[in-house]
Amino acid sequence: MVSRKAFIDKANQEGFSFNIQIPWWTYNNFKSLVWRKSLSEEQLYQIFLSLCREVEDRQMQAVADKRKYQTGFYVAACNGHEFRFEYAFKKNQELRVYNLFETVNGRKKLTLMDLLDYIMD
């Protein structure tokens, strides 16, 4: 199991991905839970682990109507940091990409590698 610090550091630097199939209303419930109170990075990490375990246990099927799905949501941590969760669907309705990255004023927080890529372009 990854430590909390390693998880947050990696998420802030690289993001992460995993395969998941889950309907939109679960995210709505999760979003409202988070918006009602501030979460520490530790709590965010624990919720993320719980969500992963729940998805692995259920293996829920995606429905045909893509419009019933969101493409991302924000989570605010108690230290003022915000995290953006994003995901996308493949043509066969499988939810394939699920990313987490830190945001500043609604924009992705730039890492050193992002800056170097921008300069090289």
Enumerate the language-model features and the residues they cover.
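Ribonuclease/tRNase effector modules and their secretory precursors
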Residues: M1-D121
